[in-house]
Structure formats: C-alpha cells, structure tokens
Regions:
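A conserved acidic beta->alpha catalytic loop
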Residues: 35, 43-52, 92
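Glycine-rich, basic loop-to-helix element that forms the pyrophosphate-binding segment
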Residues: 66-83
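Membrane-proximal basic amphipathic "stem/tether" segments
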Residues: 226, 231-274
C-alpha cells in the first residue's frame, strides 16, 4: 500500500517553555517512517528558547505558531482547527514516540476505527520505567468512573474532535469529557493496540485529585442522568482499590457476570447506609 493510501495523521504538539525537552519530541515525529504526517506545533508564547528550537525544524512542520492561549485545551483546540488529517494525535512536549516505525505499525493494525488506543510508558528523570498503561477489555462507563485514556497514545478521527472540541472551562478533565461524549454516549468505535506507542516524561499536570473529582462530577451532571451520577458518587465512596480490583476481575470472562451483580449490590448497600 502506498503512503497516500494510508490516512493523513495530524500530529499535534502543545508546548510552553519546553526548550529542554521539545527537540526530542520533534525528532520522534519527523523521523517516522510513516510518510503521511502533518505536524503541527502550538506554542503558548514561550520565552525560554523553545521557539528557536521549533524554527530549527520549521521546514518539517506543516504549521506552527507561538502565541498566548487560555490553557492547554485551548491550545489543543487550535491544533484541531488547523489540522487537515483524518486522525489527530496529541504528543506533549517532552514525550516521544517509542520507535520511528510506530505510526506505520498502528495504521497497519487499524485505520478504520474512530479511535485507536495504545499504551504509554512512563519513565522518571533517570529514564527508568515507572509505569505502563494497561488497556481494558472494553471502554465503558465503569472504566471511566476511575480512569481515562492517555491522549498521547490515542489516534482520534478529526471529525469527532471537530464535532465536540475540548471544553476550555475545564482545566484537567476535558479529554475525559470528550471520551464520555464520543465513546460512552456516542457509541463510536474503539480499537485497542496492545503495545506501547509513546514514552512519557514526568510532569506535574493533572495531579490535583480534588480538582479532578470536582470537574468529573460537574461533567457527569452535565452529561448523564442523575441516578448515574449518584452511582458514580457511591462508587467513589467504596474506594479506588475496590473498583480497581473490580475492573481487573471484569476482564475475566467467567466471573464478569458476578462482578456486575456484586457492584450493583454494593451500590445499593452504600445508598441504604449513606
């Protein structure tokens, strides 16, 4: 299959004062063997030399801009608006694709699904592996009760992103809201590529657990019926460890029915004694 029979992928990097890390990200994109790539960089008006690094590779970048924005989701929306690809991928400044052939491997695996999800590998400042994401059997509301999808290892149809865009009133969980809208409520197809796509460097974003909880509850109230929001709150009371264990068990076919029944019973018990 020739390069132009593959879908155009718009790879979007959002950056701000990332002079020490953005070059490895740029190189991991422009050195891909997958040729049908449109690379976009949205910089938030960096003052530390990031722009000079971007200019160094300007001939390899389809579009870039450096200007102030209203936060990361505003910058991501700008990237979506400028994109022409069939799929979009967001790779953060400092992160990098795991190999020069990974985009071709992903598109060889599937370029039909609305959303293609892979694994991300997190390393520390010493390049030691800290964690590796695990893909669930299915992406349903139970999954999103406690976690999300790593957007840096995700390829999303641009038409979906342009339908919803990211909610800039949210500071942490706007991508989580998008997945609820597109997957849980919209029923759009997801293909799981059970291999590492991106290596992620440590960062401090999305670490405010109280803010995450507040924003998630706001999203649920906006999108879902009241009784489902109540279920979410009850499940939160049960504790994260219980739900994580339930999700692990849920991936085992022979006890999935029992897990479903057990969760329903536990929610009812919590409601009675709440």
């Amino acid at each position: 299959m020739s390069a132009y029979n593959y879908p155009l992928i718009s790879v979007i990097t959002v950056s701000y004062n990332a002079v020490l890390t953005i070059e490895q990200t740029i190189l991991s994109v422009i050195n891909q063997t997958y040729l049908n790539i449109e690379y976009i960089i949205i910089d938030g008006g960096s003052t530390d030399g990031t722009v000079n690094v971007i200019k160094k590779y300007a001939d390899k970048i389809a579009y870039w801009v450096s200007e102030s924005d209203k936060g990361i989701y505003d910058a991501m929306n700008k990237g979506i608006a400028y994109s022409h690809g069939e799929y979009c991928n967001f790779i953060n400044a400092g992160d990098k694709f795991c190999s020069s052939s990974i985009l071709k491997q992903v598109m060889d695996f599937n370029h039909v699904a609305d959303i293609i999800v892979g694994q991300d590998l997190h390393v520390n400042e010493h390049n030691k592996i800290v964690s590796r994401s695990v893909l669930p059997r299915r992406y349903n509301l139970l999954h999103f009760y406690i976690t999300t999808i790593p957007h840096q290892s995700c390829f999303i149809r641009a038409s979906l992103l342009k339908k919803y865009y990211y909610d800039t009133s949210l500071k942490i969980v706007s991508d989580w809201k998008f997945y609820l809208q597109s997957i849980v409520l919209g029923g759009h197809s997801v293909a799981a590529y059970n291999n590492v796509i991106v290596i992620c460097n440590p960062r401090g974003a999305s670490s405010d657990n109280n803010r995450i909880k507040e924003e998630r509850e706001k999203v649920l109230k906006d999108l879902l019926q009241a009784y489902i929001v109540n279920d979410y709150q009850c499940l939160s009371c049960l504790g994260e460890e219980f739900i994580e264990n339930a999700l692990f068990l849920f991936n085992n076919h022979w006890i999935r029915f029992l897990v479903k029944k057990g969760l329903a019973i536990m929610v009812k018990i919590v409601r009675i004694f709440k």
